[in-house]
């Protein structure tokens, strides 16, 4: 059920575009009070715009609806309405509409900039936003609220300017009611159905013609398909013959192919003989050439020559290696010489740079010392020692200078604080005097404003008093008293007359007499009917007794057949016949419950057994898988170990083998490292002996022979160590490879160990537990199944009794029914036998009683009419008496108002004179205070100028001193930086490095000359070996060519032998010609068959092409679809006719029912609310505008006595307002089933006091009636405080809202406590 919860307004009409105003809507009442023009109606307008998107009347396309930019002082204003409501399904939704009004050069532009719906996703709890176009939003919100847009516009949220629409012109009234009833939509639906029915009738005729045409085409297509089928059969027969011929041709082709392949092989062999003969001829010539070019032929074999060449190559390789090693050493020496030359150049450049920096450092130290002396002299900081200063002296003097700078900064800070303190004190004195002057000035202005307000109030009170005196002058109090007495006497007389006539007792007496006569008439009618039906009842009695006896025999037979089984079920007891079925059914239900319980237990036990079996199966599978994995890992590890050890090894030996391989690897690595260290030691020894000509260990000088011997010994050691190092490297690599292979098996071995020690034992234990539990569960299941089978047998035996006993019980009930009918008939016949009147006497008595009854009815109607007229007179007199009393009370109130106005005038005059005295005293006190304030401000400004000058002088002195100190510190920093970087020590180091580079350069030049001589000797030796190598290579080439010639000779002889074995080429060619003739004959026969098939296929193709024409395409489906379409269209057309009639009748019935319901509510509300005597009630009259359509015209009628008049143009403004309100309440009651919201804007406009009170009472009764309805919401907007107090009671709302305007003339909404 939809309700509105809260609304935010910003920038609409007079509401501030910068601030948000929020209204919370209560249930059942939301009361909004405020003066005219405060902005109350804007709330209704915002509700209507949010829900329907329709702007209020006279909004000038939205220009006057949005806050004016000129008023806000901006070029554009933005507005927003945010409404939170519950949908008809109870879901919270927030509707947001945003607007913009822009001031252009010559006009204003209105724009709706955003329409958004927000809701909460019930699954995720997240906020979901959907943006809509305005038109979509206008359709979406009424659908969510469960009411139409017309109801929202014309019933729920009605603007004050449109609230009297029920009494507007007939066309407007018709449009409103048509929208509310959705009449136009349904009338159009009827017209569409009627038109569709007519169109479909025409389509049915067309469909029948199409179906006849399709039937003709279908028959033609059938004939074509029949012809195609016959041709296809003939084609298939010919194709079988063609297949046989093709098989024969293929066999002949295969034979031809074999012969051709044989011929091809012969020709290939012939070609190979020719190629190899040519190749042998070429190689033989090459052999002869090589033999002629040999300087001498070597008698050694090819293997001996190759071995000689291999060793020769090895010796040449060693010599080449030595030459390359010496060349590399030569290049290294030249590179070293170049590097030393470069380093020497760099050292010279850096020495020059560092010497320059040392000179600059000395100048900077002298400058620093001079600066320290100047500072101490100028600022009188004490005596200084003589220059140059040591580092410690400089540090002490610098610290004294810094300390003096800190003292100057503290002096400056103290000066600033003392200045601020003095200025603050002077300013406080000034502000104190200024505050006293402002306070008195403010008091004076306030007194002046109060005095002006009092003057204005005096004028208003005088006007009010004059108006009251004028009203009193028009009232004749004496005449009012006399009229009150007359009306009261007449009312008492009528009331007494009403009570004396005793209408209620007389009406009750007449009704009692009528009831008595009706009872007598019914008794006589029964006697007459009984008398007429006597003979028939006796025949019925006899038949009933006969049927009853037959039923008793059937019943006894069934009971005798089932008696023993019943006793067995009920443990030997046989219940009465009437309770037999009930007890058997109870026993059946009991045993069924027991059986169901056992079935449930058996299913649960079976489920547990199945679960255990599945678990056991799963554990078995897992155990099998683990054992399989264990075995595979074991085989894998043992195979790897066997491959490594070349012997059979079990998996248990793996840890020891891994540890052993690790130790062996570490030992080999340690030996290799030790040998490598020795080799690295021998090479520097040899190098140092060459360079320094002394022993590297004892540093003893060598002679030339000792040095040569030492170097030779070192080379021998290095050579032997190198070979040993290679062997150790191979052994270390092998040991590491074995360890790596074993280590890769570690993860597999760990998995194997985990499987054998943890996983498999745990699985076996689980399997054993599940097996034991399965045995227990299986025994329990067998027990339950045994008991269940026994119970099922008992249940089946009882179920076999149910059907016979149901028949017996049904027969027994029929026997009882017949017995009751027999007793009734016997009683009727016995009663009649006591003595009866004749038919004529009964008829005469009935006529007499009927005439008496009609006479009493007439008297009763007359009494009721007299009572109504009397009560109407009393009601009119009461209304006149109340009106006179109100007039009298009004006059008394006017007198009190005049007295009160005069008292207020006297009090205001006294207040005004007192204010004049206060203003005079305050004006006199302002003069001295103004002079004191100006003097204090002048003193403050003088002090501020003087103290600022003193502070600036001290600050300037401190700045000069700080600049000199910073210059000193900068110089000290550069000096310290020179020492920190140790540039003096670096100069000494680089000079030492330059001397060392010169010595190394001389050594390198000597070694370069030595290497050049030795390299030239080795290259000469290398050139002499080349000639010997060429001789060996030429002998090898000659021997190789000779061997190839002999090989080719053997291959040619072999090929010629193969050609002779196969046969001659001419014989094979003759056989191929014979086979080709047979192939031609078969192909001729095959072509003849193909021609026949082509003729048949041409016919088939022609027929198929004809079938593919558009007229035959999908002809069966089209014929079937057309038939279905025809039948379904005929059925649909009949349904449309039914729908048209049903909808037509439903619309008429719905309209009539709703109008009766609306008029009933209008009549009740009018009689409860209206206090005038000129109208009994009002109603809405609807007329059908034509016989053929369901269009209605509407008008509001008023009933005055027996006269019915149209209300429009004959009612006052107040009656119009009240009638419109009541009609809206009735429409809301009738149509707003899903939306219990109703907004009333100024409902008391043009209503007098009694009608306002009665309207308030009616609204209170409606709220009381709807207190159980959760979604009922009444929103009332009024300026009438009295009316608001009448309906604003605490049981209906805790707070009410007051709308007012602030100082900026912006509307504001304030929540206040409800009226007490």
Curated annotation (Swiss-Prot):
Any GO molecular function? ATP binding
Query: What catalytic activity does the UniProt entry give for this protein?
Result: ATP + H2O = ADP + phosphate + H(+)
* BP GO annotations: double-strand break repair; meiotic cell cycle; mitotic recombination; telomere capping; telomere maintenance
Domain of life, per lineage: Eukaryota
The record, for PROSITE patterns, names: ZN_HOOK
Query: Which annotated residues bind Zn(2+)?
Result: 695, 698
Principal localisation: nucleus
Query: Keyword Protein transport: yes or no?
Result: no
Give the protein's recorded name.
DNA repair protein RAD50
Q: What is known of its domains?
A: The zinc-hook, which separates the large intramolecular coiled coil regions, contains 2 Cys residues that coordinate one molecule of zinc with the help of the 2 Cys residues of the zinc-hook of another RAD50 molecule, thereby forming a V-shaped homodimer. The two heads of the homodimer, which constitute the ATP-binding domain, interact with the MRE11 homodimer.
The EC designation for this entry is 3.6.-.-
Q: Which organism is it from?
A: Arabidopsis thaliana (Mouse-ear cress)
Where is this protein found? Answer: Nucleus; Chromosome
Q: For ATP, which residues are the binding ones?
A: 13, 36-37, 39-42, 66, 68, 160
- Answer yes or no on keyword Iron-sulfur: no
Q: Which residues form a coiled coil?
A: 194-343, 648-686, 719-747, 762-972, 999-1090
Co-factor binding comment: Binds 1 zinc ion per homodimer.
Locate the residues binding Mg(2+).
Answer: 41, 160
Give the enzyme class. Answer: hydrolase
Database matches in NCBIfam families: rad50
**Which family is annotated?**
Belongs to the SMC family. RAD50 subfamily.
Q: Which PANTHER family match?
A: DNA REPAIR PROTEIN RAD50 (PTHR18867:SF12), RAD50 (PTHR18867)
